[in-house]
Each structure stands twice: as C-alpha cells, then as structure tokens.
Amino acid sequence: MQQVFFQETEFLNSVIDYDHKVETENLCLDIAYGTDKNFLFGCGISIASILKYNEGSRLCFHIFTDYFGDDDRKYFDALALQYKTRIKIYLINGDRLRSLPSTKNWTHAIYFRFVIADYFINKAPKVLYLDADIICQGTIEPLINFSFPDDKVAMVVTEGQADWWEKRAHSLGVAGIAKGYFNSGFLLINTAQWAAQQVSARAIAMLNEPEIIKKITHPDQDVLNMLLADKLIFADIKYNTQFSLNYQLKESFINPVTNDTIFIHYIGPTKPWHDWAWDYPVSQAFMEAKNASPWKNTALLKPNNSNQLRYSAKHMLKKHRYLKGFSNYLFYFIEKIKH
C-alpha cells in the first residue's frame, strides 16, 4: 500500500452515491472534479457534455465539494439516471486548505485536486481531473484506453508558447519548465507515480513557504509545474483548448476552438452559464449539453457581485443592449460604493 498525504478520515465527511449503471462492469475511467458552491452548475453540465459524446463508454464521475444543496441532489441524481451512469459526491472538510494562497477568482477549492489525486491512490491506476468549466465535444476513448509508462506522473496540455515557458522557467526557478508549462485544469494522473513522488505532500509544503509564495502567480498550477517538470506526457491541445469569453469584448481575437477540439476550457471570470455570455457561438457547446441534461429548463446565472456586474455591463454594451448595459454599470457602481 502506498502512502497517502490526505487521509480520508481527515477530509471526508460523507459520500452520496448516485449509481444508475446498468452494467456490472467495475472497470471504468474515473473522472473527478473539485468544486465549491459556485461551480456546481457548470460541473453538472460538464458531466452531461462528456456523457452526451461518450454514451456507452465506461465512465464513473466523482465530485469533491464542500457544499451540496437539495437542488443539487435532485439534479445530479437525475443526470445519473438519464445517462445510466454513476456519480459520487464527496462532501469534504476543506478547512486545512483555507490557509493556502487564494484570490477573489481562485478559492481554496483549487487545492481539491490534491485531495482527489490522493483519494484514488491504491483505488485506481489513473484518474482524470477536470476543472468544472470544461465542456466536452468529442470522444475521450483514447484517454480511457491510455496506459502510463512507469516514470510519468501525469498527462497534461501546455499553454502558451516556448517564450512563455522560458519566462515561467526563469520566474519559478525550474529549468525543466522550459520544455512546457501546463494548465492544471486537465490532469490525467498516474496515481502510483503521484504517490511515489509524494506530490501532494511536497506541494502543500511548498505552498506554505514564503519564498515560494513570492514566486507563484497561479498557486496550484505553478507548484505542480515546479514539481512535475520532466515527469510529464504532453497531450494535444484539443484536450484543453482554453478560451476566455471576455475575448469577445475585443475588436478582434483568435478563437482556438475547432471541430477537432475535445475539451473547451472556458477560462476567465465570465462563464457560459452566465446570462450575459450564453449566446456567443463558442458558448453553444455548453448550451447544447445543458439542453441534453436535467438542467435544460434551469435559468442561467445573473451577476451577483461587482466584478460580474461590470463584465455583464461590458458584454451587454458590446451586443448593443444599451439599457441592460448601462443599468448593470449603475448597479456595479452602487456595489462598489457599498463595499
């Protein structure tokens, strides 16, 4: 048995198991999410999108969260029933992670991926971790069938180009990052090697070091890049094609999403489940999955803080919806004055 840093008895409060699989085959690709209350809606649609394009595939889903309400219970059970799949909810105590670096956009939930990786040690040879703002639009059969060589810890997708990798390698003080700096929203993890390299324990230790904290800008992601350089398999960009819906506010931009894209990763503060961003062409993969899920009649989310009001106003004005745009700017300024 391999050693685990995050012990179940320390972080796991309870498990809810929505098991509606028809077959009794136990072998499956475990797909896991770590999310807080704000991303559960997106997480549900992410799962629906994978199931929509991979019906009949051997998949099991796992959601690690510190909140799960009555409506969430209803919808996720209905999703598992609709697609005859299994979705397990792990209600966790994240207090141990709250002291780690965070921002207004990245809460302590970004560290749930370490809990997830440790949970599957000795339980599954590999686990696919996905951010909840990733939507599938193709088959993931190659990931289901993939086998790791013994010396690699994870399959990842790089972001940026070689000059960016060089800058990150210099900033973070790890030469190996120059071969490729990756985004941590897609991680196919070799659990045996993750344990052997003591990734979670080393990552948390680094995140408590003042000298490391000074260097990092993307806490979990930077630390993983520092630890896993030279221990990675780089996958095609189609498995983590990043796009910010706020690019739509620019006069011109390049949309990297193509028909070959498997996973669209909606980075940035504006998400396709926001009611000011659903009608862009690049958001339609999300909307199609939503319409093929128990959330099909659920309203999209309205802005609920000053940052969202500001972006909502910008998008409304870009679409020439001036009344809505100016009214949201007014609400934005009111919120700023209040706080």
Curated annotation (Swiss-Prot):
UDP binds at residues 34-39, 131-132, 265-271. It comes from Escherichia coli (strain K12). Pathway: Bacterial outer membrane biogenesis; LPS core biosynthesis. Belongs to the glycosyltransferase 8 family. This is Lipopolysaccharide glucosyltransferase WaaO. Changing Y181A: Does not affect transferase activity. Can complement a deletion mutant. A motif (DXD 1) lies at residues 131-133. Pfam families: Glyco_transf_8, Glyco_transf_8C. PANTHER family: GLYCOSYLTRANSFERASE 8 DOMAIN-CONTAINING PROTEIN, LIPOPOLYSACCHARIDE 1,3-GALACTOSYLTRANSFERASE. Changing D131N: Loss of activity. Cannot complement a deletion mutant. Changing D220N: Loss of activity. Cannot complement a deletion mutant. Mg(2+) binds at D131, D133, H265. GO terms for biological process: lipopolysaccharide core region biosynthetic process. The lineage of its organism: Bacteria, Pseudomonadati, Pseudomonadota, Gammaproteobacteria, Enterobacterales.
